Amino acid sequence: MGSSFGDLFRISTFGESHGGGVGVIVEGCPPRLDLDVDAIQAELDRRRPGQSHITTPRKEADQVEVLSGLLDGQTTLGTPIAMLVRNKDQRPGDYKDMAVAFRPSHADATYQVKYGVQARSGGGRASARETIGRVAAGAIAKQLLAKAAGTEVLAWVKRIHTIEANVDPQAVTLDAIESNIVRCPDASTAAQMVERIEAIGRDGDSCGGVIECVVRNPAPGLGMPVFDKLEADLAKAVMSLPATKGFEIGSGFSGTLLKGSEHNDAFVPTDDGRLQTATNNSGGIQGGISNGEPIVIRVAFKPTATIRKEQQTIDSDGKATTLAGKGRHDPCVLPRAVPMVEAMVALVLADHLLRQQGQCSLW
């Protein structure tokens, strides 16, 4: 329960941080889609640990194995696609102290309350290694969206702690995002972000921030009325990622400071009859349905829970104790969370694209 996502384009992830491996089963991918498996690996490389000095030093190649669902390793058959990444660099000994004391603001305590047992080593299913399956599946969704609708999904780090970049969602490029280790397309701001992460990490602490994501050229008409609104599904998708604490779309919370006459997106005539608005405060979605304008969302991530600083907590018997986190943990999750956000957004859009085709494209 709780490890599957989507309706028609559906994924189920499996595995623990310090188990044999992690992976995903993708169901509902249309047949005859020529997949670039190297592109799947490239997405996993963006997510993998040990890629820079501001991420966890855990060393994992995160090499994907596609076990089923492809003809000649390329063409989708329309059957379940199973992908596996084996864990190679586990260190269970790092979690000895955490086996008897709950990490503040981590899932240790709530998993124990719910299940009466927990995978203490590495956090089990609460570990960010679970997102490997999501990123692999999201890479397939990205290729489906690009081929079927010409849709592009890009995310970047907008803010680290108190340092914020002002990035134009319409102008941002993947090359600019990937030009530095923090994945902020504004080079000067990125340098400040790196310095802040370094300083906080040296102090044994951690920091959070905001990731912004744009969907360019989304198919219009995606989303369902009432409970399956597109922004509602996007919110659920990205808020299911580890460490997320907030979601906004379009003008977001700042839109509450505007009057209706200031916030409304005026429609303008077009030569081809498609919908177009003069502004995009709606973030590309109105009434829960995409209007074809760029979809712009932002996701807030809290500081990493496991830190080297000593903190007050309780042990498994409820007695007061202290805990200083050991192991290899990101001082800031945001640089590696960028492909995770892209993946979850792509999965939602792929699912809704298939639902739209199934319901509204018969005649």
From Swiss-Prot:
Residues bound to FMN: R125, A126, S127, G287, K302, P303, T304, A305, T306, R328
Pfam family, one: Chorismate_synt
Cofactors, names only: FMNH2
Positions that bind NADP(+): R47
CDD domains from the UniProt entry: Chorismate_synthase
Pathway participation: Metabolic intermediate biosynthesis; chorismate biosynthesis; chorismate from D-erythrose 4-phosphate and phosphoenolpyruvate: step 7/7
Highest taxon of the lineage: Bacteria
Catalytic activity: 5-O-(1-carboxyvinyl)-3-phosphoshikimate = chorismate + phosphate
A single GO molecular function term of this UniProt record: chorismate synthase activity
Enzyme class: lyase
GO biological-process terms attached to the record: amino acid biosynthetic process; aromatic amino acid family biosynthetic process; chorismate biosynthetic process
Cofactor binding summary note: Reduced FMN (FMNH(2)).
EC number, as in UniProt: 4.2.3.5
Transmembrane domains' residue ranges: none
Keywords: Amino-acid biosynthesis, Aromatic amino acid biosynthesis, FAD, Flavoprotein, FMN, Lyase, NADP
A GO-annotated cellular component: cytosol
Xref: PANTHER family: CHORISMATE SYNTHASE (PTHR21085:SF0)
Function: This reaction introduces a second double bond into the aromatic ring system.
Subunit structure: Homotetramer.
Protein's UniProt name: Chorismate synthase
Organism: Parasynechococcus marenigrum (strain WH8102)
Lineage of the species this protein comes from: Bacteria, Bacillati, Cyanobacteriota, Cyanophyceae, Synechococcales
Gene: aroC
